[in-house]
């Protein structure tokens, strides 16, 4: 009951801090660092060089990160956090989803990220 709610709130805050760290690294072009901080399952699903290419392309198209607003969050089993943001980049504003997980004894890590460039979860707005 109450203990779970407290735990959920705590892990949600940690995940939100991780997203902010990710955006900061993105703006600095430190894509490898984002990759290194991700979960093993993320690394198993995505080769490092592919991730670096995708992030470089994202920077070219979307531009630098400007701001974000949390639209929705969900905590599953007090260890998995889904965060949906409306994210403003220089060129576009769109919805992005981040999934963080805390495995036993491990720090929280990025399990998945999804950029909704097709506008399934919210309008893609061209800013420039």
Regions found by a protein language model. Name each.
Residues 16-17, 32-82:
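Short solvent-exposed beta->alpha transition segments
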Residues 1-9, 45-50, 96:
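Short charge-dense sequence patches
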Residues 8, 20, 36, 40, ...:
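Acidic-enriched, low-complexity/disordered segments with a strong bias for Aspartate over Glutamate
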Residues 1-28:
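Short, low-complexity N-terminal intrinsically disordered segments enriched in polar/charged residues
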Residues 26, 57-60, 105:
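Structural motif
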Residues 72-128:
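Exposed beta-sheet edge and beta->alpha loop/turn motif
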